[in-house]
Amino acid sequence: DGQTFIPMPLVVSAVHHHLIVKKLRSKASIVCISGNCIEDHHFAVLIALGASGIYPIGSYKTIQKYHPESDFYISLDNYRHSVEKGLLKIMSKMGISTLTSYHGSMLLHAIGLGERLSKEYFPSIPSLIGGIELEDIEKTLKERIRLQVGNNNSWSLKENGLFRYRKSGEAHGYSPTVFKKIQYLGTSGKKPNNKVNDDRPIYIRDLLCYKTSRPILNLEAIEDSSSILKRFGSGGISFGAISEKSHRELAKGFSLVGARSNTGEGGEKSDRYSISNDDISVNSYVKQIASGRFGVNSEYLAAANEIQIKIAQGAKPGEGGQLPGFKVSSMIAATRSSSPGIPLISPPPHHDIYSIEDIKQLIYDLKDVNPRAKVSVKLVSQPGVGIVASGVVKAGANIILISGADGGTGASPLGSQKHTGFPWEYGLAETHQTLYANGLREYVTLRVDGGIKRAEDIIFAAILGAEEFDFGTSALIALGCVMARQCHLNTCPVGIATTDEKVEKRFKGKAENVSRYLESISESVRNELSKIGKTSLHDIIGRTDLLKINKKQENLVKNKKIDLKAVSYTHLRAHETDY
């Protein structure tokens, strides 16, 4: 009959706010009967929008269909328990311990919702790059039903590959095609015949392109590869999350080309420190300090060229970290000053940092221990990060790292992988613009990480304000990672994300795989610079006037009503980029 259902979040939020306006909200509960409320994220959204109770009829019917009557109540209890654990995890990210406090809190962000839709139905939830309106949602839902039912009324559902990659499903940033190309770069050093990335847009930067010049500059006029490589670094990947051997090879791979290696939050074996080891290539350039303070002592800090304070992780902000007990071997325990077999948890907050004054004190103390080391602070890309970054610069940080949601660990919960964090494009642009507006930009180096794997990513990040660039997942892929996403199980098929000595024997990666990958990216960056008509990365930092909408994506941007002004806002004249 041409009608369709109304999405439950839309209904709940509309009713919730209407009752508030009429001063009737406290007199009634809102109970949802929903067929598409399945994951913990779905429950969290409905509760945050005002739902008092949820009956996930679709989930219950599915459990009933696939489990015999004798197991139904056990399976139902397991499902409810997993949803409850997920909700507790989500609430804890905001420091909330009771469901009553989370109820109607509107503690959400939106990406891709139009301004009219947000103001009318989701007030107080910012939607930062524009997007679809009510009529677009209706059109999409009707089209889905038409495609699903077809002419034969078949209701069999296709797997859309939301979590596990499927060739005909949702596009993934690290699809098998992509990681095979990265590994090809790591083994051969030669660029594959086709691009590293999928043609389908996945990131905000895929909607943009940069202006090119005619004629293209000769490569001899472009800064050499070694200068570009000095701007590269490793993401913080801890010893414990990955094996000791792969951690060494990763550090060595970055050191071989003059790039920065990073310990991650798990400390480092003292035999790798440059003060006690002639082979300084395995001494991580950056020593990270996280909330758990694992492996942190004066010797560790003294061996650092840079000390990084990790406030949060872009892939799972507000979550902290956890190393399961079965991954805590005697070697890990010794390095982290712990006991074998005991789970190690980094809490979401630093319990000695509750203000800018606290972080200023920590920076002062770290510089007191190691005066020659620079101090960087890792912040998460999100709305408002620019103001926080300004305070951190005033507190004495030398480097600000903006971490995006698109990188991160294969051990992250599935809900965090899909529904937590912000693209680095937004946080980086806001931070650069805020620092510039407050006269602080010249006092700090801006760095970025989170899903960086191509030369084009480097160019876009530089245009949005970054001077340095960190590779995490892509560097591990060059080392041999096959994206099995079982890092937390200690059963890595290629012996990287494991502390089991038997499993570690599968590891075949070499430092040269990483160095070749980085060298290939740096050469590709030189090629891109020649197309733009600039001789160095320095010349394009903050030059958002070089951006324009990608012609291939013009229809998508128009149809989805996407507004990229927040990302590509230009406040600099061509001669004002001297950082």
Feature map (PLM): residue ranges:
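Active-site entrance/lid segments in N-terminal catalytic domains of soluble metabolic enzymes
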Residues: 1, 10-16, 196-433, 437
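Glycine-rich phosphate/ribose-binding loops and adjacent secondary-structure elements
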Residues: 1-85, 90-99, 109, 114, ...
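Conserved phosphate/anionic-ligand binding catalytic regions in large, soluble enzymes, centered on
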Residues: 45-52, 94-103, 240-253, 259-261, ...
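Mobile "lid/hinge" segments at catalytic clefts and subdomain interfaces of large enzymes
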Residues: 61, 318, 326-336, 475-537, ...
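Amphipathic alpha-helical packing elements
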Residues: 85-111, 524-548
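Polar, glycine-rich mid-to-C-terminal structural blocks
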Residues: 108-140
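Conserved acidic/glycine
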Residues: 138-139, 144-211
